[in-house]
């Protein structure tokens, strides 16, 4: 079991991280941040909702979705859209790519040093590249 003093230190760190991002640290936002920002991981909104309400359901589905969107817009999380109906929230916001196993639903980071993009196509006039997302979709061998 985690010591109370360690929990207070973690809360202070999370609160400071939220404030530095310009986010008001409400209790629900702190709880969601503790789940997602504790370690590099990928979670869906449903997984976050389940985890945050594991002991006592206090956070609504709308609050989770709104908070995840806010965290992503402020750069605390990265949205990884593996298909139109499946979005993961990635606590690793540095540039990197992913493997997505369609059969298992597992999303895994790819070491960015192993992927090289040598040439991008010409961009439409008046635009600039904002990023390149690569998701390699996998299936298990039958």
What are these regions (language model features)?
Residues 47-53:
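A short acidic, leucine-rich amphipathic alpha-helix
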Residues 23, 37-40, 54-55:
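Short helix-capping/hinge SLiMs at alpha-helix to coil transitions
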Residues 64-71:
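Basic amphipathic alpha-helical segments that dock to polyanions
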Residues 30-35:
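Pre-recognition alpha-helix immediately N-terminal to the DNA-recognition helix
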Residues 73-142:
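Non-DNA-binding regulatory cores of transcription-related proteins
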């Amino acid at each position: 079991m985690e010591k109370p003093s360690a929990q207070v230190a973690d809360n202070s760190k999370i609160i400071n991280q939220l404030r530095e991002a310009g986010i008001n640290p409400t209790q629900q936002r702190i709880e969601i941040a503790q789940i997602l920002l504790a370690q590099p991981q990928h979670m869906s909104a449903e997984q976050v909702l389940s985890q945050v309400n594991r002991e006592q359901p206090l956070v609504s589905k709308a609050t989770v979705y709104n908070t995840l969107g806010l965290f992503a817009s402020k750069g605390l999380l990265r949205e990884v859209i593996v298909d139109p109906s499946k979005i993961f929230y990635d606590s690793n916001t540095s540039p990197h790519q992913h493997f997505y196993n369609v059969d298992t639903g597992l999303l895994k980071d790819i070491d960015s040093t192993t992927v090289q993009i040598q040439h991008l196509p010409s961009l439409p006039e008046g635009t600039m590249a904002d990023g390149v997302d690569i998701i390699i979709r996998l299936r298990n061998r039958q």
